[in-house]
C-alpha cells in the first residue's frame, strides 16, 4: 500500500508541477489563450478539491483511530503534500487557494507554526485572484484565526513570524472590507493576556 501511495503522490507532484508551470506561462503570455487558461484553471481546481476532500475524509474517519495514530498519519500526509499545497496555492487562483487553505486548516495540529505561515503565504498569493473577496474565504479564514487564538495562542505570542503572518492575513481581509476581520483585529490584544 505504501508503494502505491508513494507512486500516486509522485504522479500528483508531477501533475501539479506541470499545471502550475503551464498556468504561469499562460498568465504571463502577451497573447493569452483563454481556452487553455480555462482548462488549466479547471485542472488546478480539481486537484485542490481532491486533496482537500482526502484530508476532510481522513479527519472524519480519524475518530476511530487513537490520537497518536491519527496525528501520525496526518503528519505523514502533510509531510508528503505540504510542498504540493504550496505550489497549488502559488497560482493565486481563488478557488484553488480556498481548497488549499481548507486542507491546511485540517492539518494545523500537525505543525501549527508551519501550517499558519503556509496559510499566510497562500492567502498572499490568493490576492492575485481576488481570494479575499470570496465569502467562503472569509469564513475559512475567520474560523482558522479563531482556532489559532483559542488553541495556539502561545505560538502567536512567542513567534514574531506568526504574529506578522496573522497581521498580514487580517490586513488583507480588512482591506477587502470584511467586518469580521476588522473585529478580529480589534480583539488582537487578547493574544497577550
Language-model-derived ranges and their functions:
Residues 1-193:
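Non-catalytic all-alpha helical scaffold/repeat segments
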Amino acid at each position: 500500500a505504501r508503494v502505491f501511495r508513494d507512486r500516486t503522490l509522485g504522479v500528483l507532484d508531477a501533475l501539479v508541477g506541470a499545471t502550475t508551470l503551464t498556468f504561469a506561462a499562460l498568465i504571463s503570455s502577451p497573447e493569452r489563450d483563454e481556452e487553455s487558461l480555462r482548462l488549466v484553471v479547471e485542472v488546478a481546481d480539481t486537484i485542490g478539491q481532491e486533496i482537500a476532500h482526502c484530508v476532510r475524509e481522513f479527519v472524519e474517519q480519524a475518530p476511530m483511530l487513537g490520537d497518536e495514530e491519527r496525528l501520525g498519519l496526518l503528519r505523514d500526509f502533510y509531510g508528503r503534500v505540504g510542498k504540493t499545497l504550496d505550489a497549488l496555492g502559488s497560482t493565486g487562483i481563488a478557488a484553488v487557494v480556498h481548497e488549499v487553505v481548507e486542507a491546511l486548516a485540517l492539518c494545523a495540529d500537525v505543525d501549527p507554526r508551519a501550517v499558519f505561515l503556509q496559510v499566510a503565504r497562500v492567502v498572499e498569493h490568493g490576492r492575485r485572484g481576488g481570494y479575499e473577496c470570496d465569502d467562503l474565504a472569509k469564513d475559512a479564514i475567520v474560523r482558522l484565526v479563531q482556532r489559532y487564538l483559542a488553541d495556539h495562542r502561545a505560538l502567536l505570542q512567542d513567534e514574531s513570524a506568526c504574529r506578522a503572518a496573522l497581521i498580514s492575513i487580517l490586513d488583507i481581509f480588512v482591506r477587502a472590507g470584511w467586518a469580521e476581520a476588522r473585529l478580529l483585529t480589534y480583539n488582537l490584544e487578547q493574544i497577550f493576556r
